Amino acid sequence: MRCSPKRSLTAVIAASFLLLLLLLLLHRGSWQDPQEVQFRDLPSDAVLKILKQGSLHILQDTDNLCALHNISYHLLAGSPLPHKKFLAVGLSSVRRPRGYYLPDTLQSLFKQSSEEELQEMVVVVHLADADPIWNAQVAADISHRFAHHILLGRLVLIHTPHEFYPTLEGLKRNYNDPEERVKFRSKQNVDYAFLFTFAANLSSYYLMIEDDVWSAKSFFTAIRKAVASQEGSNWATLEFSKLGYIGKLYRSSDLPRLARFLLLFYQEMPCDWLLTHFRLLLTQKDVIRFKPSLFQHMGLYSSFQGTVNRLEDDEFQADAMDLPDNPPAALFTNMVVFENYEPSKAYSTARGYFWGKNPAVGSIFSIVFHQPARVTRVRVQTGSSERPGDFLHAGVLELGRGRRADGRDCSVYTTVGTFEKGNLEWRGLEKGMPNPVECVRIRVTQSQSEWLIIQSIGIWTAGT
């Protein structure tokens, strides 16, 4: 397939500009200072090696970018509706040596969504196996199981013919990966690039998942709320899972350049690494990840050689609507905060947690509401799998009234619960304290040598 001279020139210019951006990000301060490298997931010398070796093939592979403008997809089932939805959910699927999880994944997506949510959502499955017989069999199976959703335009199955793929033979073996792994991950990058291109005009936002995940109930509404909370910010990626590229959300307007990015560097590194670099190139330095996670990995066997893969997200919550209200508040503690693990990270739905040094008898963590609230339920989780000893060994939860003049505390507190093995959850608190409260406080009742991690604090209020 050939491109016009004008299109080829545009592709070369775009590739050169992208390469320049990568070099600037890698060494924005000094060519001699490797600490300035922003690609934290990749050693700087490895990236430089890739760029030096790849500078030639970048110009050669611009023909691959032209393919994105001329793809003739095979519609295996369903057809996109003419009007845009709020959300497109995209996943790519190939034959696994062991296990077949696609039907369960689709069932979870549809079952965990209300009728109103489904009206604003479309699911696109890219059946990307090289075996056309397998693709046809899966398409027939899915069409039979989900005929209702296909007829309503909620589910579309596509395939990209082999002739549109770049070469998958003789690829560079970066990181000493075996040849078969390099071929697998390189094809996976191209699979996603073609999927992104197809989905770019279907919706306002695009959610990336895998073909072996469970979805939380009402994940759609949780995502809509998360997007609204980021209004006015120039985010590139929002994340709703800790695992790989499960639960990554993009603006659909960014999908064409993300597709070009994956296709340009398809043989260099795995997809999740490229997605991280894409986020950095779009100047989003920090990960924006929401808690709890909305998607859980369920597949036991990976799509690469059928190896056992027991990955699980320990922050997954099955009901996305069972989310705390967490009224606007100021947070205070008399514990010494370690580095940037601020109190706000325990109270926010975003990524991170509070980490305090040397909790002693009388150490406190206070939440002072901007406005009084009727608290009905409180849930606090401390400790972490990485630091299992850094949980609250002994402590109580208190509700307070009579906010002091300095706005940092309340004058009167009532103890409502005791921590058990670092965790606490109490419901029906409005029965004991029917009037609005102004403070919620965690108080340490026994000194401990381990530091204290507060993973999350959830507060539910009446009337919300």
Curated annotation (Swiss-Prot):
Q: Which residues cross the membrane?
A: 11-31
Q: In which pathway does it act?
A: Protein modification; protein glycosylation
Kindly list the places in or outside the cell where this protein is found, as annotated in its UniProt entry.
Answer: Golgi apparatus membrane
Glycan attachment points: N70, N201
One biological process term in Gene Ontology: protein N-linked glycosylation
Family annotation (Pfam families): MGAT4_cons, MGAT4A_C
- Catalytic reactions on record: N(4)-{beta-D-GlcNAc-(1->2)-[beta-D-GlcNAc-(1->4)]-alpha-D-Man-(1->3)-[beta-D-GlcNAc-(1->2)-[beta-D-GlcNAc-(1->6)]-alpha-D-Man-(1->6)]-beta-D-Man-(1->4)-beta-D-GlcNAc-(1->4)-beta-D-GlcNAc}-L-asparaginyl-[protein] + UDP-N-acetyl-alpha-D-glucosamine = N(4)-{beta-D-GlcNAc-(1->2)-[beta-D-GlcNAc-(1->4)]-alpha-D-Man-(1->3)-[beta-D-GlcNAc-(1->2)-[beta-D-GlcNAc-(1->4)]-[beta-D-GlcNAc-(1->6)]-alpha-D-Man-(1->6)]-beta-D-Man-(1->4)-beta-D-GlcNAc-(1->4)-beta-D-GlcNAc}-L-asparaginyl-[protein] + UDP + H(+)
Name of the molecule in the record: Alpha-1,6-mannosyl-glycoprotein 4-beta-N-acetylglucosaminyltransferase
Q: Which GO terms describe its molecular function?
A: acetylglucosaminyltransferase activity; alpha-1,6-mannosylglycoprotein 4-beta-N-acetylglucosaminyltransferase activity; metal ion binding
Which EC class heads this enzyme's classification?
transferase
